[in-house]
């Protein structure tokens, strides 16, 4: 969609929210079967807060994530938003960084982004997918 021509429909609505995300222990992989212990991860990288920043202006919904989200998710999220009459803008690097979030079926793939940057283990792909779908479904238009 050409977002430069998106118009606000009806009365302008402005909403903001922050959703804290609960993650498991960090599991930074060094090799297929070797991971840094959570205490070592924290001593090297510190505590890593995780959250979504949400802003809605009229029918435009902005969701910003602490995790770098794989583009594989975007098509389904955009379709869901369009069903609700919303224009979705998803961004990452919102002030914290929790690594790369991929669909769970790609967790063991041999891609360097998935291996080295997937810091909190399997299960986060489905978790983030559900979270963002919930945000879209709860947005008003």
Description of each model-found segment:
Residues 1-141:
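Non-catalytic substrate/cofactor recognition surfaces at enzyme active-site rims
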């Amino acid at each position: 969609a050409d977002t430069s021509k998106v118009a606000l429909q009806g009365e302008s609505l402005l909403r903001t929210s922050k959703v804290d995300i609960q993650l498991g222990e960090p599991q930074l992989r060094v090799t297929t079967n070797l991971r840094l212990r959570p205490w070592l991860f924290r001593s090297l990288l510190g505590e890593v807060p995780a959250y979504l920043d949400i802003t809605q202006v009229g029918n435009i919904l902005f969701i910003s994530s602490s995790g770098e989200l794989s583009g594989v998710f975007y098509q389904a999220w955009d379709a869901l938003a369009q069903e609700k009459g919303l224009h979705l803008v998803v961004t990452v690097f919102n002030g914290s960084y929790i690594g790369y979030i991929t669909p769970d079926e790609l967790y063991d793939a041999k891609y360097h982004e998935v291996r080295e940057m997937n810091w909190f283990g399997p299960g986060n792909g489905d978790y983030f997918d559900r979270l963002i779908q919930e945000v879209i479904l709860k947005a008003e238009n």
